[in-house]
A protein has these predicted regions:
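N-terminal secretory signal peptides
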Residues: 1-12, 19-27
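Conserved C-terminal helix/tail region of periplasmic/extracytoplasmic solute-binding proteins
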Residues: 305-334
Length: 334
């Protein structure tokens, strides 16, 4: 996969995982909003795994677009796909950043989200270990302690890697932590491996000599922007406004990579070489959502179904069709 900067130069345990992906199905009193006339505030997340969201927040493109309509913008940080999907399901945000496969799991579990935009094509996850651990391949993880965040692309990546080695989750000892805590646990020696996520993964590589012992860019599902289905149905014009602002931010990011680096450094407090490593693995040039994303997400879904994570009676292809909504595409489907 060509990197973000390279493309600029060229073109300028089933229930547990499903529960984490869906998150909080029965939150009481959650402020779900369906009436367009009532919308006085659009609520989005920002995340260090979604560089475009940082540019959008910093530059104020959406605030400018909504100002004349008297609609405010509120930002909430998501620490992982699981958190973004939890916030969406609970009605705390209207738009959230997640991995495509994580969004599929959430929808299978009843979280009514639609994936409407591809903010990145990343290689943001891999399996990570210490350089002296003796772990060199997924088969070596049998009986080992692995830090992972349930309901996220790194978790799904781990399941698929274990599956490819003839192993299941039960053959290892999963330690459930948020991504940053997983890095800490690995470096302290509390776990043997970590299903990593950038930029924490890049930081562990550069600052602590951690080793990405298993990589598979094709098994990283796309970074997608999700919206609550009822919000999109009631407010299609606002969805288009958000996508247009995202496009403004994405175009700006490609033209101004130094600004993206500065925004990520400020948000993460990580040094520039770490952020450069993350961005080298991140392609921002394919925002239209469609066939390519569907194929990637469906492949992950079928693997998870084979592993027993998605129920056997679930029609994965139909679930993917229900997830991806191309109506708001900024350009042709890919």
């Amino acid at each position: 996969m060509m990197s973000f900067l390279g493309r600029r130069a060229a073109s300028l345990s089933r229930r547990a995982l499903l529960g984490a992906a869906g998150c909080t199905l029965f939150l009481i009193g959650a402020p779900h909003r369906a009436d367009a006339a009532e919308v006085k505030e659009v609520r989005l997340d920002w995340a260090t795994y979604n560089p475009v969201s940082l540019v959008l927040k910093e530059k104020g493109f959406l605030e400018a677009a909504l100002r004349e309509r008297g609609i405010a913008v509120r930002w909430t940080q998501s620490l992982g796909s699981n958190k973004a999907l939890e916030y969406l399901n609970g009605g705390a945000i209207d738009f959230g950043s997640s991995a495509g496969a994580a969004a599929l799991l959430a929808r299978v579990n009843g979280n009514p989200v639609k994936a409407i935009y591809a903010y990145s094509q990343p290689e943001w996850t891999a399996l990570v270990t210490r350089k002296d651990s003796g772990i060199a391949k997924p088969a070596d993880l049998k009986g080992k302690r692995i830090a992972v965040t349930r309901g996220t692309d790194p978790h799904i990546f781990l399941i698929r890697a274990l599956q490819g080695a003839g192993l299941a989750e039960r053959d290892a000892k999963l330690v459930l932590l948020q991504h940053a805590d997983g890095r800490t646990a690995l470096e302290r020696g509390d776990v043997d491996a970590w299903a990593g996520l950038d930029p924490m993964m890049a930081a562990s590589e550069i600052e602590n000599g951690s080793v990405l012992f298993f990589r598979d860019p094709a098994a990283n599902t796309w970074g997608v922007l999700d919206v609550r289905e009822d919000f999109a149905k009631a407010n299609p014009d606002l969805v288009r406004t958000v996508i247009a602002a995202y496009e403004e931010a994405r175009t700006y990011a490609i033209a101004n990579p130094d600004a993206v680096t500065r925004a990520l450094v400020a948000a993460t407090k990580l040094p520039e070489p770490v952020i450069a490593r993350q961005l080298a693995r991140t392609d921002l040039t394919r925002p239209a959502i469609g066939r390519v994303q569907a194929e990637s997400i469906q492949a992950a879904g079928l693997a998870l179904q084979q592993a027993g994570v998605i129920p056997p009676e679930t029609n994965v292809a139909s679930a993917v069709d229900g997830l991806i909504d191309t109506r708001f595409n900024p350009g042709p489907e890919r």
